């Protein structure tokens, strides 16, 4: 298996699809990485030689992916919570951030219903 950015890339998939296994690489970014590395999008990972995989590694290394990206996102959320701004308060209370209604919906964000004692 090829390892790119610390992730085992599935070998039986096309290059574009396999690159999306990396956190921070979506389909559009995967297409641009393949184009910059000079690798055909329909080539399967198992058919690539070591030089092509190295080119893909170099292109992926130009972006913030995996652990660094996760850390960056969590630090941004923590910063909002420390500031005490509206979005930070909503994060702290595990409520929707972007103005959705919460009287009847938002079950995914709020979690299961809590029974009221009589």
Swiss-Prot record:
Pfam families: Ribosomal_S13 (PF00416). GO terms for cellular component: cytosol; small ribosomal subunit. The keyword NAD does not apply. Keywords: Ribonucleoprotein, Ribosomal protein, RNA-binding, rRNA-binding, tRNA-binding. Residues 94-118 are annotated as: Disordered. Gene3D superfamilies: 1.10.8.50, 30s ribosomal protein s13, domain 2 (4.10.910.10). It comes from the Bacteria. The keyword Transcription does not apply. Part of the 30S ribosomal subunit. Forms a loose heterodimer with protein S19. Forms two bridges to the 50S subunit in the 70S ribosome. This is Small ribosomal subunit protein uS13. It comes from Pseudoalteromonas atlantica (strain T6c / ATCC BAA-1087). The lineage of its organism: Bacteria, Pseudomonadati, Pseudomonadota, Gammaproteobacteria, Alteromonadales.
């Amino acid at each position: 298996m090829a390892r790119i950015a610390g992730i085992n890339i599935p070998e039986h998939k096309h290059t574009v699809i396999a690159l999306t296994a990396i956190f921070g690489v979506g389909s559009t970014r995967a297409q641009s990485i393949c184009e910059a590395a000079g690798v055909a999008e329909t080539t399967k990972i198992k058919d690539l030689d070591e030089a092509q995989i190295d080119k893909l590694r170099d292109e992926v290394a130009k972006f913030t992916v995996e652990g660094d990206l996760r850390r960056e996102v969590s630090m941004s959320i923590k910063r909002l919570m420390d500031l005490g701004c509206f979005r930070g308060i909503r994060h702290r209370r595990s409520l929707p951030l972007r103005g959705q209604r919460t009287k009847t919906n938002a079950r995914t964000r709020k979690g299961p219903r809590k029974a009221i004692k009589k």
